[in-house]
Design a protein with these regions (language model features):
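ABC transporter nucleotide-binding domains
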Residues: 1-239
């Protein structure tokens, strides 16, 4: 069984590609395949290149290099953070694992800078995830993803578990971070309102295959695929943004 078949996508620096489709279309599987998060039983063929490096079969140091180059923000900020670790410990763990080249002082400075970048105060370092709101937890998850200075972040439904007003704040934060760093986003979502707000290009998935891809305006205003037109008519929109 091929959960994802024949995927061919290119992401440039400072670009957001939205991967959209209904539940079961394969979009989350595609995102996890890039980061080698599917488990040993998953069979992946082809190439996955990040900054020219083929990461299709990473092991050992290569896997660590992949994790440094590409990170993920999960859908649920309530389960993606270890409840036993403070925010400071969570961010330090990411740096110790993926940036052993940094000194202790550099890591401390990096952690403080990450909190500032995502709009949290320094006293958050000593607090635990349950002490934060959903939006604040997602900011912590974003800071963790940014910790090793990746070139790519996969955003897997990063706002769907949040209130609409908070969704806008998180999307604005992601946009500002991209403008400041040039990072690329692969945005996995079913919400075309989110797509309209942040994406540069759109790829539409159905049954594990991409059925349409193009610039945002072309796909939304002049969809070539009947399936894309059906999605545009059926999926929820993000109000209030």
């Amino acid at each position: 069984v091929h959960a994802v078949d024949g995927i061919d996508i290119t992401l440039r620096e400072n670009e957001t590609l939205a991967l959209v489709g209904e539940s079961g279309s394969g979009k989350t599987t595609a995102g996890k395949a890039i980061l080698r998060l599917l488990g040993k039983e998953a069979k992946i063929s082809g190439s996955i290149r990040i900054c020219g490096e083929d990461t299709a079969s990473p092991k050992g140091k290569n896997l660590k290099a992949l994790r440094q180059a590409a990170q993920i923000i999960f859908q649920d900020p309530f389960s993606s953070l270890d409840p036993r670790m403070t925010v400071g410990e969570t961010l330090l763990e990411a740096l110790e694992s993926l940036r052993p080249d940094m000194s202790r002082e550099e890591k401390s400075e990096r952690i403080r800078g990450l909190l500032s970048r995502v709009g949290l105060r320094e006293d958050a370092l000593r607090r635990y995830p349950h002490e934060f709101s959903g939006g604040q937890r997602q900011r912590i998850a974003i800071a963790r993803a940014l910790a090793p200075e990746p070139k790519l972040i996969i955003c897997d439904e990063p706002t769907s578990a949040l209130d609409v007003s908070v969704q806008a704040q998180i999307l604005n934060l992601l946009g500002r971070i991209q403008r400041e760093t040039g990072i690329a986003y692969l945005l996995i979502t079913h919400n075309f309102g989110v797509v309209e707000y942040i994406a540069d290009r759109v790829a539409v998935m159905r049954s594990g295959k991409i059925v349409e891809e193009g610039p945002l305006e072309d796909v939304l205003q002049h969809p070539a695929s009947t399936y894309t037109r059906e999605l545009l008519d059926a999926v929820p929109r993000l109000g209030g943004i």
